[in-house]
């Protein structure tokens, strides 16, 4: 599977030949991809995005072509794009390949859970839009912000990141953007031995006993509000709930590493005090 995706990336990179002067209608697939285009000041070229594109507000007013991990071919084609910018986690691969075969320039950009991947992603996107100088400027700005945020004091805390999308909790382990952000903020992920996102039960939460719980805003909403979340089985008995250390975060801030990563670090460091 990894080899197939790698070969697809090479193929798409080789076949994406649209001139930057022709890039007027862009479809973005992936919340961070969309956010970067806007951070570069090029949001006016975006004609559609996907359901993970939650920031900035302007992105919410665009037509949606589905979810970036299960992109519908027809939805993208119907927007008549001259460029598709896709996270490397977008798919299915066959859809991206088909877009390229239809003559639609489809560029897959770096999207690993690290700030270095973020910097590569910015430069790749800026290059495709013909604004490499803006990409360099944005990267420098974010590097400085991240360095300043990391230098801020924090207290080591045993933390957990929870997501509720289907009524039950999933928790972030190693290899996720959430884990990387926790580490950058000087926090210890209680599930660092776990790979990826996995379900966590009320009993499991009680045993893990995190000092700090980070939960996404959408998950709090899905749980019926913050008070209802605090009272959920397994949550109420944790040290985090006892000491009122439950931090609600913007979904993209904690679940991805995008242009506002320094803001995420600042929020987590403040929550740890």
Short names for language-model regions:
Residues 1-8:
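Bacterial N-terminal signal peptides that target proteins for export
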Residues 11, 15-16:
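N-terminal signal peptide c-region/cleavage motif recognized by signal peptidases
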Residues 17-21:
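Sec/Tat signal peptide C-region and signal peptidase I cleavage site
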Residues 24-25, 117-127, 136, 217-273:
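Structured C-terminal subdomain patch of bacterial secreted/periplasmic proteins
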Residues 25-79, 83-89, 208, 226, ...:
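A short, structured surface patch at a secondary-structure boundary
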Residues 25-37, 133-187:
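Basic- and aromatic-lined ligand-binding clefts that recognize polyanionic substrates
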Residues 50, 172-197, 217, 247:
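His/Asp/Glu-enriched short active-site or ligand-binding loop at hydrolase and phosphoryl-transfer sites
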Residues 94, 110-123, 160-177, 221-224:
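Extracytoplasmic ligand-binding site segments that recognize negatively charged/polar headgroups
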